Amino acid sequence: MIYVSRRLLITCLLLVSACVVAGIWGLRSGAVTLETSQVFAALMGDAPRSMTMVVTEWRLPRVLMALLIGAALGVSGAIFQSLMRNPLGSPDVMGFNTGAWSGVLVAMVLFGQDLTAIALSAMVGGIVTSLLVWLLAWRNGIDTFRLIIIGIGVRAMLVAFNTWLLLKASLETALTAGLWNAGSLNGLTWAKTSPSAPIIILMLIAAALLVRRMRLLEMGDDTACALGVSVERSRLLMMLVAVVLTAAATALAGPISFIALVAPHIARRISGTARWGLTQAALCGALLLLAADLCAQQLFMPYQLPVGVVTVSLGGIYLIVLLIQESRKK
């Protein structure tokens, strides 16, 4: 029988409840504020047609994609931090979301607004970047510090490459890409969720299936190898899952920073344990991104900020607080 601590169970239930409450609030909020009863009526198909369209065609895709993208980024960050055994191990710092964004830019310049091409190019960009960082960091094995430093260097080069692409693109493409680069959920509809959303769901399932390997790797390479785990193959497979999660999220909403870095930290702090780490990180990531999107919509009405601006601001503050706390401990 699997024992689950009371605090962990309560934490997960509270996170789920908070996601539901924030989701309902997101369906109520907008240029026209609705009552909760009107939202449920629209979801059941009992509301006027115009109200049903506002809720189900405009607001519901945005809320669900915020939850899904946040969960994907949270799980991706938790996998990277587990593999690197380093609190700074995340796709933001390593440059993998920048690689995915490079793929998106190339697709926009070459293929315009084709969603399938954008999603596939984002994944190719993220995977190629991760393989490049992996190969450059390989020296009879992978050293975590070397991997992070090389990732930061590759990210800097990709930022320069992306700037060059924007300068070479047409004005319309550059403006569209500039908005996307800030990380935005504005204008998300059901038609724009494919094929990225199904890919995220598949990768979340794959991550759940790899939890046992991840836990064994956290015990140390020698212990994992003694228990029959192929260390480098498992590490590469888990990194691939995390990179595809990041790339698919980037294809949907652009490069949204700090969710992958912050969500696993918050999950561990509020639950006091690393058990169910991916589940906690997914719930925290989903709640953080949805809350940030609600702030982006509501704080500066009638203007809407890109959600990436809010996540960078909040994530930067959290990172500063975290560093201050760590320095005081020492």
Curated annotation (Swiss-Prot):
Database matches in CDD domains: TM_ABC_iron-siderophores_like
The record places the following residue ranges in the Cytoplasmic compartment, namely: 29-62, 114-117, 168-190, 257-275, 325-330
Residue stretches spanning the membrane:
8-28, 63-83, 93-113, 118-138, 147-167, 191-211, 236-256, 276-296, 304-324
Could you state one GO cellular component term attached to this entry? plasma membrane
Keyword Transmembrane helix included in the entry's annotation: yes
Ranges of the Periplasmic topological domain:
1-7, 84-92, 139-146, 212-235, 297-303
Recite the UniProt keywords alphabetically.
Cell inner membrane, Cell membrane, Ion transport, Iron, Iron transport, Membrane, Transmembrane, Transmembrane helix, Transport
**Coiled-coil stretches noted in the UniProt entry, renumbered to this chain:** none
SUPFAM superfamilies, per the entry: ABC transporter involved in vitamin B12 uptake, BtuC
Gene Ontology MF terms: ferric-enterobactin transmembrane transporter activity; transmembrane transporter activity
Record's subcellular location: Cell inner membrane
Which InterPro entries did the record assign? ABC_BtuC-like, ABC_transptr_permease_BtuC
Tell me yes or no: is Glycoprotein among this UniProt entry's keywords.
no
Q: How does it sit in the membrane?
A: Multi-pass membrane protein
Which terms does the UniProt entry file under GO BP? ferric-enterobactin import into cell; iron import into cell; siderophore-dependent iron import into cell
Q: What is its main location?
A: membrane
Q: Which Pfam families match?
A: FecCD
Describe what upregulates or represses it.
Controlled in part by the amount of available iron. Induced 1.4-fold by hydroxyurea.
Please give the family membership noted in the entry.
Belongs to the binding-protein-dependent transport system permease family. FecCD subfamily.
What assembly does the database describe for this protein?
The complex is composed of two ATP-binding proteins (FepC), two transmembrane proteins (FepD and FepG) and a solute-binding protein (FepB).
Q: What does this protein do?
A: Part of the ABC transporter complex FepBDGC involved in ferric enterobactin uptake. Responsible for the translocation of the substrate across the membrane.
Q: Could you identify this protein by its name? A: Ferric enterobactin transport system permease protein FepG
Q: What is the lineage of its organism?
A: Bacteria, Pseudomonadati, Pseudomonadota, Gammaproteobacteria, Enterobacterales
